[in-house]
Amino acid sequence: MRKPEGCRVWETQGEFIMKESELQNHVRQSLALLGYTIIEIGKTRAKVRCNKCGSYSHATGWQGNTVGAPDIYIHAPWWASCAVGIELKTTKGAVRKQQQNLADQGMTSICRSVTEVLTIVALFEDNLNHNVQAEKVRKFLEVNKHVCF
């Protein structure tokens, strides 16, 4: 099996799977090209040492993040005070109970690809009657369908 063009991925059992950090980068870049603002939430990129046991891990609690909070919020200047919360997962990534609870309440969407994220954004644009912008997002998806989405 060939690696998809333009993607840094790892292979497992003959299937290529993008790392979550790569997925987030692709999502951020795609949305930025379409004029959206992306607010990233979550753990720091650096690991910190635990004062009690000495082990290293990604720090989250001290940042004040709610457990289960989405990875990103998407906003657009033409949305007034609205935003879309997206929890990104790899194709094999497990969803935590808190993440699923927020998704079940309609507060976030769990997405496993750029295509899923952009589809959510297009539907949100439709709900706001921003049909021209929704079509712009769909055309972007169509033009880039050969890319690792």
Regions found by a protein language model. Give the residues of each.
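Catalytic phosphate/metal-binding cores of nucleic-acid and nucleotide-processing enzymes, i.e., regions
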Residues: 1-149
